[in-house]
Regions:
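Membrane-embedded alpha-helical segments of integral membrane proteins
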Residues: 158-223
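Single conserved hydrophobic/aromatic residue that forms the stacking wall/gate
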Residues: 2-13
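Membrane-interface micro-motifs in multi-pass membrane enzymes
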Residues: 21, 25, 49, 72-116, ...
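Short hydrophobic/aromatic helix or loop-helix immediately within or flanking a transmembrane segment
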Residues: 21-39, 51-52
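Transmembrane-helix motifs of polytopic, lipid-linked glycan transferases
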Residues: 50-68, 106, 110
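Short aromatic-rich membrane-water interface segments that cap or initiate transmembrane helices
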Residues: 15, 19, 34-41, 192-203
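Transmembrane helices and adjacent periplasmic/lumenal helix-loop junctions
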Residues: 92-95, 114-152, 168-178
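Internal/C-terminal transmembrane anchor helices
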Residues: 224-230
Length: 230
């Protein structure tokens, strides 16, 4: 009986895993659900959240330093982390969103370190993969990769506009095939929030990365810290 019960539980687990991974962002959902089981242990939840946000701060700083290598801008480099920290305090925000953000930063960091010859191919291929792994955060990847090319005067900067099209096609195809319930959840960050509540702050977390990229690129013209005295 115990063996049959174990097999039954294993079958249920496999079905749940399959159903989860069939969703757009299924990997991020699965990881967040896996981590949630440890939240019953005292102080474990805050520690896990802190570790995730620390990784966000590290990866975003590494990406931004590719645009501006100045060492006197640590607070500016932390703006994406700060925006995500604030939204993480909202109970209607799912930790799935932070994990998806981490996947975005990881793939974007890899993108910034790839040689020009294959970077464009990597960008095209990784977009549908990121959509499947992490969901609509793929659009932020496409925008950020495009910004990076223009801000670093990349050789493929104009053709990189196609990233936006591929991200949109991935979302539309995913909705048509049933991986996303509707186009809103395929394109917008509402996919990472309680659908019954409005969490407007999630948009600030998405705006923060490309806006910070623009800011550090602007500050690149100054070799020394900008004087408040002019």
């Amino acid at each position: 009986r115990d063996v049959e019960r174990s097999r039954g539980l294993g079958d249920v687990y496999k079905r749940q895993l399959t159903e989860t991974l069939k969703q757009a962002g299924g990997v991020a959902i699965y990881i967040s659900e896996f981590l949630s089981q440890f939240y019953v242990v005292f102080w474990t939840g805050p520690i896990i959240s802190a570790l995730l946000l620390t990784l966000v701060a590290l990866l975003s700083s590494l990406i931004l330093k590719k645009i501006n290598s100045r060492n006197d801008l640590p607070l500016i480099f932390l703006l994406p982390w700060l925006s995500l920290l604030i939204i993480s305090l909202d109970y209607d925000y799912y930790e799935q969103g932070t994990i998806a953000y981490l996947f975005l930063l990881l793939f974007l960091w890899l993108y910034t370190n790839i040689k020009t010859r294959i970077k464009f191919i990597y960008g095209i291929c990784i977009i549908p993969i990121l959509y499947g792994i992490a969901g609509p955060i793929v659009h932020l990847f496409a925008i950020s990769a495009l910004f990076f090319e223009f801000l670093t005067n990349g050789k493929k900067k104009y053709i990189s506009i196609i990233y936006l099209l591929i991200a949109a096609l991935s979302a539309i195809a995913g909705t048509y095939l049933g991986y996303s319930r509707n186009l809103t959840l395929a394109f917008l960050p509402e996919a990472y929030c309680n659908p019954l509540q409005t969490v407007s702050g999630i948009y600030y977390a998405w705006y923060a990365l490309p806006m910070t990229m623009l800011l550090v690129a602007y500050l690149k013209r100054y070799k020394e810290p900008v004087s408040l005295k002019g």
